Amino acid sequence: MQANFKPLIVWLILDGQAEKALNLLAKNYKVSTPKLKVGLPKGHKAKAFGCYTPKGSTISLLNSDIMKNPFVILHEFYHHLRTTVDKKHKGTEKNADKFAIEFIEAYKAESRKGSQVSQGV
C-alpha cells in the first residue's frame, strides 16, 4: 500500500469520486468492487446513512449527499471486505468504524502537513 493511499481514498470520496475510491480499495484489498446506489433497501431505517447488502454486493446510501461522506463509504466497504473474505457480517460494527476512522485520521494527518493528497490521482 503506497504511503498516501488512505488520504487519497478519503480525498476522492470528499471530491465526489466515491466509485473511483471503491475501485482503488477493491484493487488494493484484492476483492471485487461493490456496487454503489442511492436509496436504502426496503425495511432499512431511514436514520441509517448507509447499508451493505452481501447479496448483490451493494452499498446503498440514504441520499446522494452521503456519496461524499468518507466515514459511511469506508464503513460499508469494510462490511463488503469482511463478507467477501470470510462470509461473516455479524459483530463487525466496531471494526467497520475503526477501519473508516483509520483512513480519515490518515487524511487529517496529511492535511496538517499541507500535502497535496490529490496528486496521487
Model-derived segments and spans:
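Short amphipathic alpha-helical interaction patches enriched in hydrophobic/aromatic residues
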Residues: 9, 81-85
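Short pre-active-site segment immediately N-terminal to the catalytic Zn-binding motif
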Residues: 57-73, 86-91
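Active-site His/Glu-centered metal-binding helix of metallohydrolases
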Residues: 73-82, 95
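Aromatic side chains
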Residues: 52, 78-80, 99
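Auxiliary, metal-adjacent structural segments of Zn-dependent hydrolase domains
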Residues: 2-59, 64-66, 113-121
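Metal-dependent phosphohydrolase cores
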Residues: 28, 77-80, 108
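Post-HExxH zinc-binding segment in Zn-dependent metallohydrolases
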Residues: 89-121
